[in-house]
Amino acid sequence: MATLIRSKLSNVATSVSNKSQAKVSGMFARMGFQAATDEEALGFAHCDDLDTEHRQGLQMDILKTEVPTGDAPPEGDIHYQRDGTGLPPSASKDEGLCSELSSSEKPQITAWEAGWNVTNAIQGMFVLGLPYAILHGGYLGLFLIIFAAVVCCYTGKILIACLYEENEDGETVRVRDSYVDIANACCAPRFPKLGGRVVNVAQIIELVMTCILYVVVSGNLMYNSFPNLPISQKSWSIMATAVLLPCAFLKNLKAVSKFSLLCTVAHFVINILVIAYCLSRARDWAWDKVKFYIDVKKFPISIGIIVFSYTSQIFLPSLEGNMQSPREFHCMMNWTHIAACILKGLFALVAYLTWADETKEVITDNLPSTIRAVVNLFLVSKALLSYPLPFFAAVEVLEKSLFQEGARAFFPNCYGGDGRLKSWGLTLRCALVVFTLLMAIYVPHFALLMGLTGSLTGAGLCFLLPSLFHLKLMWRQLLWHQVFFDVSIFVIGSICSVSGFVHSLEGLIEAYAYNIED
C-alpha cells in the first residue's frame, strides 16, 4: 500500500515538474531563449496553444459565423466586419503580404484629401446655428467652440488608436476596421455584439436627425425668403421632400459625389456673403452685448449645438484606413480642427455682434430681405444636395444591421439574387424619407433639434464612447495624464450631454406648447 502511494505521489510530482518546466521554457522562449529539451519544447507548444485558446476561446461565439456558399473568401482574407464577425487578421507573413496587396488595390487618398473630407464634415451648414449659441453663452460660448475643437481632435486620435494593437514582435498593427469593431471588442467576451449595436443605434439616430435638420432648414429658409407667398413652412418642407424622394432609389454614392464640389462652393459663397454684410455694419457692432454670464436654461442647448458642429468620428476609421500615409492622420486632425476653430469662432462672433439680442436660430434669417433671398437659395441648394449623404449612410447601416447579417438578420434580405433592391425594400426607403418629412413638419425648430442631437448622439460618439473605449482597450499602455484626460472628458461629456438633452427637450416641449413656429 505504501509503495502504491509513493508511486502515485511520484507520478504527480513528475507531472507537476514537467508542467512547470514547460511554462518556464515557454517564458524563456518568448524572451528569445531556445528550449533545452524536446520535452520542454513540446510543453511550451502545449502552453502556447492553451494561451491562444485563453485569448481567443472567449470570442468563439462571434467567430462562428456562416460563410455564404459561392464566393467564399479565403481564410487569409477574412477580416473583422462592421458587426464584429469574421476572423481577425492573421499575423503570418504570407497573409500580411496578401493584405498589403489587397489594400494597395484600393484607391488611397492623401492627407490633404482626408483633411478636405474632415473639413467638409465639421464646416458644414450647421455653423449657421453657432451665433445662436453665442447669444446664450457669451464669451463662454466662444471658449466652448475652442474647447470642443480640442476635445474632438483628441477623441478622434484616441479612437483611431483603438484600431491598433501590438503584435508579438512589438509592431503596431491594425486589427479593427470600424467604430463598431472597437465597440464590440470592448464588450467582449460577455456581450460581444452589444457595443456594436449601441454604436449602430447612435449612428442611425444622428444620421436620420441630420436628414431631418436638412428638411427643417429648407422649409424654414424658403418660408423666410418669400414671406409674402401664401405658402407655409410645412408646405415648403413637403416640396423639399418631394425633390428628395428619388434618394430612395440610390444604389451608391457615385451619382451624389459629383455634387459635393457644388456644396462646398455654395457654402463658401454663403459664408462670404454673411461675413461681408456683417463687416459692412462693423460700426454698429454691439460689443457690450457679449456677456460674461450665461443663461442657465439655454446654455446647455448651446453646448449641444457646438458639439454637433464638430461631429466627424463616425467616418474617421474608414478615412484613416484609406489614407496613403496613416502616420499623417494626427497632423491632418490638428490643422483641420485648428482651422475649423478659428473660422467658426470668427463667424459666430461677427454675426452675433451684428445682430446681438435679435440673433435668430438660423443666422441668415437676420439678413435684409434682398440679400436673404439670394443666400437662402444657396443654402437650400446646399441642404438638398447634402441630404443624400447621411440618408444613404443611414440606409446602409439599417440594411447591414437588420437585413444582411445572414442567419442572424432580424428580417429577410432586402436584395434579390441578382443584387436588385426588392420592392418592399424600396418601400421602406421611401418610408424613411417620409419619416424625415413628418419630423420636420411637427418639430420645425432647427436650433433645438440640433442641440438635442448634439447632446444625445454627438456627445456620445465624440466624447463619451471614444474616451471609454480608449480606457478599456489600452489601459495598460496609458500614462497617468492620458487616463486623467479620458476620465475628465467622460465626466464632463456626461454632464453636458445629460443637461443639454434635458434642456433641449424642455425647449421643444415649451415651443410645442406655445405653438412657436420659429
Curated annotation (Swiss-Prot):
Main subcellular location = membrane
User: What is its subcellular localisation?
Assistant: Cytoplasmic vesicle membrane; Presynapse
| Tagged with keyword Isomerase | no
> Which Gene Ontology MF annotations are present?
gamma-aminobutyric acid transmembrane transporter activity; gamma-aminobutyric acid:proton antiporter activity; glycine transmembrane transporter activity; glycine:proton antiporter activity; L-amino acid transmembrane transporter activity
GO terms classed as biological process: amino acid transmembrane transport; beta-alanine transport; gamma-aminobutyric acid import; gamma-aminobutyric acid transport; glycine transport; neurotransmitter transport
Q: Where are the transmembrane segments?
A: 126-146, 198-218, 259-279, 299-319, 335-355, 377-397, 432-452, 455-475, 483-503
Topology term for the membrane? Multi-pass membrane protein
Q: Which cellular component terms (GO) are annotated to the entry?
A: cell projection; cytoplasmic vesicle membrane; presynapse; synaptic vesicle; vacuolar membrane
| Job of this protein | Antiporter that exchanges vesicular protons for cytosolic 4-aminobutanoate or to a lesser extend glycine, thus allowing their secretion from nerve terminals. The transport is equally dependent on the chemical and electrical components of the proton gradient. May also transport beta-alanine. Acidification of GABAergic synaptic vesicles is a prerequisite for 4-aminobutanoate uptake.
Protein known as:
Vesicular inhibitory amino acid transporter
